[in-house]
Amino acid sequence: MDECLPNSCLLGVHLVISTHSGPQIVYHYPPSNTAFLTNNPTKHQHLYGNHANLNKNTSTNKEEKLFNSGSTKTASQIALNESAKSYNTAITPSMTNTNTNNVTLPPTRSHANTVGSQSSIPAATNGVGYRKTDIEDTSRTFQYQETESETSSSGLSDSELSTDYLDISSDSFSISSSLSSSSLSSSPSSSSSSSPPQDGLSRTNSSFQSTDSMSPTSPQMIMENDSISVAESYLDSGTNNKSRAASKRSQNFFHKLSTKKSTDSKTHSPVRKLKSKPSQSTKKGNKLLKNTSNETDGNAFTGSCSISSKKSLSSTGEHNQELRNSSLNDTPGQSPHHYHHRYHHYHKNAATSQRNSHTQYDVEEEDMEVSAMLQDGKISMNEIFFEEENFQDINKILEFDNDFVAEFCSPEREMCNTRFEFTVDNFCFLGLPIHVDSQGRWRKSKHKNKTRSKRSSSTTTNISRKKSIASKISSLSENTLKKVNSGEADTVYDSNIGHEASTDTPNLRINTDVSGNEFEREKEDLGKNMNMFHVCFVMNPHLIEYNKRIDDMYQFVVTRLSLLLRYVQSKTSYISSECHIILKEKERVLKHSKTYQSIRGAGNKGKYLYQRILAKSSLARALTECVDKIQRNEIACLEINDDKVISLQIPIQNEFEKMPNFKLQPVLRGSYLTSILNMKFLEKSSLRIESQNRQNDQAQFSDTNNNIYRFGNNINSTGHCGAANVDDGDDNESNYYCDDNDDLLNYALLLLDEPNNIISSLETFSYQDDIGTIILKHLVRNIQPNIPLRSYRYLITDLLDNPSSLDDLTTETNSLESSILRSCALHLMYWRHARIVIPLSSKYTYIVSPLAPIQGYTIDDYKSTSQNDGNVKKMDDRENNKSGSDRVPLIYQNSMLFRSKFPSLPSLPIFLSLLSTDKPQAYSNIIPSREHKPVYLNALAWLIQYGYVTQLLTFINIRVDKHIKMAVDEDLEKEGFRKTNTARRPSMDYKKTDKKLDDEDGQSRDANASEACSGKNEGMQSNDNNKDVDEKDNENDSRVDDRDDNEIAIADEEEILHFEYDDPEMQHDYTIILEPERATAIEKRWLYRCIYGQPSDIQILFNKLLKYFNGKVPMELVIIKEEISRHDLKKLLNALDKYLIEIHHW
């Protein structure tokens, strides 16, 4: 069993939503195959190593990458740079190669898609870029692309490439085919060349595409800035130059169609030449291509709009110009009905071309945004999942179809809002599905307004929903609005009106608002139809570790993330909005992105798709980061809805109160062996915060400015991991609240890293102007491990400029400064920057830890002792044999660090030998002089930080011997407690007296004696009165006596159960009082007898420290908490050495 080792067993995550049309998978990560994710010898190793070397030495060094916690930050930074580089290199040579001999059609590209070097950006004029095309090498280039496309797969199903989004009828094919048929007849030699068939394209359409695009007289269409300009290629270079100059001067192709006078302009002279073709060939071409279009599916046209179809689209647009001119001239042989029919097709085709142009422009502009986000580190994902040997179809999750996974991850409403655990083969699907209630609410309202009507409530909900949707749409259309307001945007054709829109800015704003309204309506429809969402995690733990791994994942990650998402969904419809963004972006990339279709390889295509989705959706970024960080056993800091921050982690078990059996259950080297557990404070604080959140609905999550309390969302609770309903209001609180006196401010903080590294990490995961971050950085710079936290209240007072009285103890404990200090300490503890210790002192005793990292080569060198996975053991043995001479043992690595940090001190082995003696002694015994004390204390802090040394604490128990018991028994007999009914029940007297004493206070012996005497007199009077009653009363008295005997017998059993280790019958010589603070009456008499005859100062000090003499609280902490001196404590121990037992333990 490896339960003590950090292993999340997490494979991936997927988001499922359920609407009226059924469940569907919105997003899943990673899209890797099952063999790679579940391969134990290499599982997660790429996550720990340096990402920069993965692409270089994937095959040779894949097995040599080990976990190194110290290089996590550097590796993540290098990984971001690699992501940006791989994003640029993922584009095919047809887009980035500057060699004109290898250039592919279409030769014109906007620099928006060219994110590589500056040399790959073509010259641009008026937003349109041109690239020269070598017609002689065209055939060879297309032949190479066709071969490459045949050997590569997109990893997509046919359903992903459907053309439901395009509103193009088969008539549009016939309209756009006249020019291509003419070019077929004019250049038969060009038909031998073929364009590369893209993924999802049929062979028929592919060959047709090539013949049209390879014609020397076919025009080339360049889409840029929502406009379409025509540049025609002719065999005559002079004519070609003139046509290109004319196309540069043109601002919009459809604007030229808006006026009849534009048909006589010079820019349309090439169109007249094209129109002078015989009309018979045009009619034949229309019939031929009409039949061809009926046989081809929608995927064919999508492919024609992807990469090589720029000429085809331009042919369509050019022939629409020709068709409009011929329609406006009303040529003979065409009826008015025929004119209107063709004019209707022109409007429809022009609107479609404009919509495709606008979509393509947005895609190219977003490519640049993705590249910028990659370079800035805003998009991060593990690229090894997208390698060709590891990537799988994006429509599958662990070789299961998306529909199959969506079905069983969408339970009924009665089974939602509780723990979901579904096992398929060796995989466990774990989650917390969130479903709306019968009234359509995501969560119960804490503040119900009974006087409000249902109609007003629904109206308010719709208004708030529209406001939230409008706020998100504004961010999407920000770039478009800027261009509209500056007058740089081009005109947009309005197909609904039937004529072209002018270039005025108000009309453009109206069109922008119309598209925004459509986006808003679709998003609102999805929000209304969605009734369930489920963030489901996939795991594959070992059978022997199944319960622990699953419970930890559910308790620390699944529950917290799902409840936060439910909160933001109920407030702002965040989940439905993000799902709509993901689905629309996925559809745009798969159907309209030429960059996507030009990329070769299924892995590169999938990587580009995920980069585009991550650039758009914050929810996708959060889920991706959560999986990557949890797999690396790191802390995932997720940003939800731009104003909610939550940190998730599965705590690493690196602290133990009892000695672990590390030979059978390996642990991390350098783990801490101590009774001061950090997790106890984190769990206690989490329970307190959750109870506050239950009382105040807006606590923690809604407060975005007071970021100092954000740690409350990060700390994990200790409730049961069962399938308790999340709507239950009861707390499953453990008995942590019983130790409220254990204040965190009585401890000291020991930093686990250099202060500069911690400060840089705080700046990365927090806001720069946050008051909490400022306090944390100031505290990290000044913290010392030998000073309690309560001594740093002056720092908070100086920063907040809020002086307070330090004289009142209540004010000092519950003040704002104290609360901020506790929050800062918990934050540093949760983020693994520090741990709490008892303030270091040279007068305390320290020993070498049994878990000291002496053996092994790294802190995670536990795999060699693994009993579960033979492959891992063999791999580690092979690595050890291959690089045995190059690897340095861990003790010598730390020795070099110790020597560099403390050059004036003995070496690490010698220093440890000084502490490891037969009889533990105070740390001051090894300090040579007073001048060496600061250096030795710093060395002690370093040794505790690396797990070499632990503190030997002192615990005290109270032992009561038989002499104390006999003295108390004699006192009870003198006071008359032993003389009641001794003749009739001699064996019950002692226990009955104990029962009477337990029911009383026991604070004062005199009060107890007087009460006992009064009870005795009343008993004697009752016995005298009983002599005068009749026989019937005597029978009743006997029944009462029998009932008293039964009650006493039951009380005796309870007494025996209460005293687990005590012996009331005094069969043993001594008794240990386990809980002096909750002592019974007889135990209090024993304690009073122990200090009887002692000086008053000893009695006062004993009563003050009595509650700590339970063997659980170390005396080193009591000295700080009660503010007493070691001398007073030593004096007390010497005076009561017969009754106080000292226990030395870690």
UniProtKB/Swiss-Prot annotation:
Chain positions found as Phosphoserine: 76, 486, 987
Compositional bias segments (type: Basic and acidic residues): 986-1004, 1025-1042
Superkingdom of this protein's organism: Eukaryota
Biased composition (Polar residues): 105-123, 201-221, 237-253, 277-303, 323-334
GO biological process, alphabetically ordered: cellular response to amino acid starvation; cellular response to nitrogen starvation; meiotic cell cycle; negative regulation of small GTPase mediated signal transduction; negative regulation of TORC1 signaling; positive regulation of autophagy; protein transport; pseudohyphal growth
Signal peptide (residue range): 1-25
Annotated stretches, region: Disordered: 90-159, 177-221, 237-340, 440-466, 979-1047
Keyword terms, alphabetized: Meiosis, Membrane, Phosphoprotein, Protein transport, Signal, Transport, Vacuole
Record has Calcium as a keyword: no
Membrane topology: Peripheral membrane protein
Pfam family, one: HTH_NPRL3
Transmembrane segments: none
InterPro entries attached to this UniProt entry: HTH_NPRL3, Npr3
Compartments reported by the entry: Vacuole membrane
Gene Ontology cellular component list: GATOR1 complex; Seh1-associated complex; vacuolar membrane
Task of the protein: Component of the SEA complex which coats the vacuolar membrane and is involved in intracellular trafficking, autophagy, response to nitrogen starvation, and amino acid biogenesis. Mediates inactivation of the TORC1 complex in response to amino acid starvation. Required for meiotic nuclear division.
Family classification: Belongs to the NPR3 family.
Protein name (record): Nitrogen permease regulator 3
Taxonomic source organism: Saccharomyces cerevisiae (strain ATCC 204508 / S288c)
UniProt lineage: Eukaryota, Fungi, Dikarya, Ascomycota, Saccharomycotina
Gene for this chain: NPR3
